[in-house]
């Protein structure tokens, strides 16, 4: 039962089974992500969940796993949508990765000269290049905290479906719960997307170090 599972995990008297995330905890988190990351309209099936000790740890595991499984190799081309959480800038520069990074900047302006923190179509179209194997994005952005516009989201979806179907998307949606009716790219492109979500920001519990 749920209470038995939680009691054993608090006591820590044995290894967790399954080791990636506890059974009943996974069911709860699946529903939570469907509500908060998919605006209550999740894709068919279920997400493969892995509990981690915080969002930053999840990032490190993702980079490592992508390379160890030969999905990304040293020197491969990736795209980075900026502004972005700082480690996404620093990790690709490490010697073991040395990725060829294409930066896509949120520098779209209004006619009045105000910053919208959104992306130009011609910059998003860089993702059509099949040499770009992965796209890293913080959505909503960090620190501006603006979610991708509907138009940009649809453009990325069309690029994946029509131009670069093997593009891997790594989206860090930690602040998604602060956006009304937020819908992650993992809800739109579940077979291409790896999502990092941390509970710490929304629940004000950064010291807990809990994420999926």
Question: Which residues make up each language-model segment?
Answer:
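Walker B catalytic acidic pair
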Residues: 173
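Residue-level marker for buried hydrophobic side chains located in beta-strands
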Residues: 169-170
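Active-site PLP attachment segment
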Residues: 188-212
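Conserved core of the PLP fold type I
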Residues: 4-164, 176-190, 194
């Amino acid at each position: 039962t749920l209470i038995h599972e939680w009691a054993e995990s608090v006591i820590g008297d044995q290894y967790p089974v399954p080791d990636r995330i506890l059974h009943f905890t996974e069911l709860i988190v699946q529903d939570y992500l469907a509500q908060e990351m998919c605006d209550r309209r999740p894709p068919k099936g279920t997400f493969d969940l892995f509990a981690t000790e915080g969002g930053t740890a999840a990032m490190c595991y993702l980079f490592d796993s992508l390379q160890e499984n030969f999905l990304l190799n040293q020197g491969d081309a990736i795209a980075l949508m900026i502004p972005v959480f700082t480690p996404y800038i620093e990790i690709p520069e490490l010697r073991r990765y040395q990725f060829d990074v294409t930066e896509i900047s949120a520098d779209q302006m209004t006619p009045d000269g105000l910053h919208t923190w959104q992306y130009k179509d011609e910059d998003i179209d860089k993702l059509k290049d099949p040499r770009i194997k992965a796209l890293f994005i913080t959505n909503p952005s960090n620190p501006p905290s603006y979610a991708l516009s509907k138009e940009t989201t649809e453009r990325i979806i069309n690029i994946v479906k029509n131009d670069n179907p093997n593009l891997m998307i790594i989206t860090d949606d930690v602040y998604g719960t602060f956006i009304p009716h937020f819908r992650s790219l993992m809800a739109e492109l579940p077979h291409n997307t790896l999502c990092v979500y941390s509970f710490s920001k929304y629940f004000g519990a950064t010291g807990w170090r809990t994420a999926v």
